[in-house]
């Protein structure tokens, strides 16, 4: 399970031509592997997210990129953070994650969520549905994907999906861990308790105890052993050798994006940031709140392998 994950959130880098983007992504993944991270994640989106960039920024298709990264790494597990369930037929997704497991020699993880970015759906002609319908679709999908990953041939005539004796050969090389992303206490964490090996929360440090209490309650109702589920948190981070370097990198990133300095102030209000000691203290507070690990991204300077290595060393020591 994830103790220390590294997410690659953006693909536009200062001074890097389009022909060099993939090599820069590979360098991040290799630096993460070399510095203590146990998983490398990429987003499953077609447009860049608000707060990181613009819709027309560079964005690679998730599973193609993960399969390519598998050829350049040896130890880290590989996953989407997280797969938008609405983007793919669930039986096809089962085949896709199985292929990733084989090309990575058994290092695939299925990270999945209900999907949320309406602009992508509208632009690509993918039905967005209602909030409740997206969760209905996720649950139906899990009842197709998970049996296929276990060697079964599920049939389902559901409200949203229909499969008949769906075959998945070859089978994964080993049991593929399932991680469900999100923090919704009624729907998401209930699905974690019912289907997942891991939960990845998107919430504040102060909210962690309440989220864990909700997960505990769902496990108790469903008869699930809570100790089987590991809980991590997504952390948007900025780190530098010093506090001042960290802030300077954020300002340089904002300038590269053409953002006003007011955006930097907004980012500082959202990020876990600072020099190594400051970042370590903030992450220790998260661990002390009850989670098992963190997954971080370095939006402003992750394209610099030295910063990935600094984050790995710092967080490895902080988590203990």
Where are these regions (language model features)?
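An alpha-helical appendage that flanks or caps ligand/catalytic pockets
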Residues: 8, 33, 132-167, 172, ...
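Acidic (Asp/Glu)-rich catalytic clusters
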Residues: 33-34, 66-75, 97, 101-107, ...
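Internal, glycine-rich beta/alpha segment that forms the wall or movable "lid"
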Residues: 2, 52-53, 80, 86-195, ...
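Short, acidic/polar
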Residues: 19-32, 93-96, 181-194, 249-252, ...
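Hydrophobic faces of well-ordered beta-strands that scaffold small-molecule active sites
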Residues: 4-8, 40-42, 77-80, 108-112, ...
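N-terminal beta1-alpha1-beta2 module of alpha/beta enzyme domains
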Residues: 1-72, 174-176, 251
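Active-site beta-loop-alpha junctions enriched in small/polar residues
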Residues: 9-11, 45, 83-85, 113-117, ...
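Active-site mouth loops of central-metabolism enzymes
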Residues: 8-23, 81-91, 173-184, 237, ...
């Amino acid at each position: 399970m994830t103790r220390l994950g590294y997410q690659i959130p953006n693909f536009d880098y200062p001074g890097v031509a389009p022909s060099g983007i993939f090599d820069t992504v590979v360098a991040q993944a290799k630096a993460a592997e070399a510095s203590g991270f146990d998983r490398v994640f990429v987003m499953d989106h077609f447009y860049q997210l608000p707060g990181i960039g613009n819709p027309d920024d560079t964005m690679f298709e998730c599973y193609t990129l993960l399969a390519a990264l598998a050829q350049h790494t040896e130890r880290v597990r590989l996953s989407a953070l997280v797969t938008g369930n609405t983007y793919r037929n669930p039986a096809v997704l089962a085949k896709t994650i199985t292929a990733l497991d084989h090309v990575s020699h058994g290092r695939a993880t299925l990270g999945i969520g209900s999907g949320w970015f309406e602009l992508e759906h509208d632009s690509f002609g993918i039905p967005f549905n209602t909030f409740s319908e997206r969760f209905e679709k996720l649950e139906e999908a899990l009842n197709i994907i998970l049996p296929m990953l276990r060697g079964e041939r599920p049939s389902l005539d559901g409200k949203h999906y229909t499969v008949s004796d769906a075959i998945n050969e070859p089978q994964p090389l080993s049991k593929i861990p399932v991680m469900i992303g999100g923090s919704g206490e009624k729907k998401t964490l209930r699905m974690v308790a019912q289907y997942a090996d891991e939960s990845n929360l998107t919430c504040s440090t102060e909210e962690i105890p309440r989220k864990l209490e909700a997960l505990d309650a769902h496990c108790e109702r469903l008869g699930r052993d809570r100790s089987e589920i590991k809980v991590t948190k997504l952390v948007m981070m900025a780190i530098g050798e010093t506090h001042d370097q960290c802030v300077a990198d954020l300002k340089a990133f904002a300038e590269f994006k053409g953002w006003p300095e007011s955006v930097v102030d907004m980012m500082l209000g959202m990020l876990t940031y600072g020099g190594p000691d400051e970042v370590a203290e903030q992450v220790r507070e998260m661990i002390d709140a009850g989670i098992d690990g963190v997954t971080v991204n370095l939006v402003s300077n992750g394209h610099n392998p030295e910063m990935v290595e600094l984050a790995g060393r710092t967080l490895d020591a902080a988590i203990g």
